[in-house]
């Protein structure tokens, strides 16, 4: 028996009543959710995430999903006999790897998520950064051991044209965005889903960015588990970034970009927890780590 089934009818009513302030706070607001990690591998977590997105839409929140596909891309590369390599937390993307990335993100991962959400109603529509000029990318390098390092067809989002996403939101749909994007010359690049989610959240005026991870939140001194922090401001995070584990850097860079770009708060949450997004949005306790633009000077901490 699951915990929800063990609740009495009165308990369930209290849960709904307690959520009312948060339902009011986020009604008609855009929440960008970066979907990745274990939440997109485990079948139960996939279904729970899809149900969460349908729930948000049903109660008047406007979710926008930006997804990665790292495990699926790695599996397909292995199946095709192609070598996969990471540098500085980013996948090295040759033209051959880019073909696989494009195929897997939009043709496999995105389609599956759209189908799971649409099991709850005709809500989700899949698009990519190539569609309607949503994203324009610029090729990036990463710093590895203090040296700038080429990682191939990997880009940063430098321009966002939000019209297509806003049109879908206005039509009551849930945009599901695959993170591939052309540069100014039309050359398609692999965009890290964390950084793409941050750029999109900034570009469409989101109320919140939520990034799913495979850890409880941000550890300021990993692997010391007592260093898990529930909140951090942009200045402190910027100082901490050079000392973070490589896998967390893109996620925390994304949160930093979002809040510096006008998004009120960004959160990294544990995607291994079923319904983690609902826990973050609709409970006073929240979950994971919240990033704010600056230290609250008035004692008020954003939700």
Swiss-Prot record:
The record marks 34, 251 as: Transition state stabilizer. It is found in: Cytoplasm. Keywords: Amino-acid biosynthesis, Arginine biosynthesis, ATP-binding, Cytoplasm, Kinase, Nucleotide-binding, Transferase. It catalyses: N-acetyl-L-glutamate + ATP = N-acetyl-L-glutamyl 5-phosphate + ADP. This is Acetylglutamate kinase. InterPro entries: AceGlu_kinase-like_sf, AcgluKinase_fam, ArgB, Asp/Glu/Uridylate_kinase, Glu/AcGlu_kinase, NAGK-C. Pfam families: AA_kinase (PF00696). Catalyzes the ATP-dependent phosphorylation of N-acetyl-L-glutamate. Belongs to the acetylglutamate kinase family. ArgB subfamily. Transmembrane segments: none annotated. Substrate binds at residues 69-70, 91, 190. One of its GO terms (cellular component) is cytoplasm. It comes from Nocardia farcinica (strain IFM 10152). Pathway: Amino-acid biosynthesis; L-arginine biosynthesis; N(2)-acetyl-L-ornithine from L-glutamate: step 2/4. One of its GO terms (molecular function) is ATP binding. It is an enzyme of class 2 (transferase). It comes from the Bacteria.
